Amino acid sequence: MKVGLKMLHDQVLIRPHEEKDGAGGIYIPDSAKKKPTMGLVVAVGAGAKNSNGTFQPVCVKEGDIVLYRKWAGSEVEHDGVEYVVMKETDIIAIKEGK
């Protein structure tokens, strides 16, 4: 999925998985919904230099489903789509399998 944004350094662009309506189609107001903590990686930076000056590439790749810290990153909108931009270190895990 190309979004027309190039991430820099160790930044990762994630499209959060949206919460579905409540059981039986009950409407859940935005204020009561949980903040997503899982999403699809849509763009990644090339990496960053670590403390000893060597280049460290990013471990995640486009298409990965990741679990991230609840309040990580910054919410951004691009072309009408909501994303979260965060540092790779705010990603906790990569989902394996289908």
Swiss-Prot record:
InterPro entries attached to this UniProt entry: Chaperonin_GroES, Chaperonin_GroES_sf, GroES-like_sf
Top-level taxon of origin: Bacteria
Any single Gene Ontology cellular-component annotation: cytoplasm
Record-level Gene Ontology MF annotations: ATP binding; metal ion binding; protein folding chaperone; protein-folding chaperone binding; unfolded protein binding
Keyword set includes Cytoplasm: yes
Main location: cytoplasm
A Pfam family it matches: Cpn10
Subcellular location: Cytoplasm
SMART domains assigned: Cpn10 (SM00883)
Tagged with keyword Cytoplasm: yes
Gene3D superfamilies: GroES chaperonin
Coiled coil region boundaries: none
Keywords: Chaperone, Cytoplasm
HAMAP family attached to this UniProt entry: CH10
Assembly: Heptamer of 7 subunits arranged in a ring. Interacts with the chaperonin GroEL.
Protein name per its UniProtKB record: Co-chaperonin GroES
Source organism of the structure: Neorickettsia sennetsu
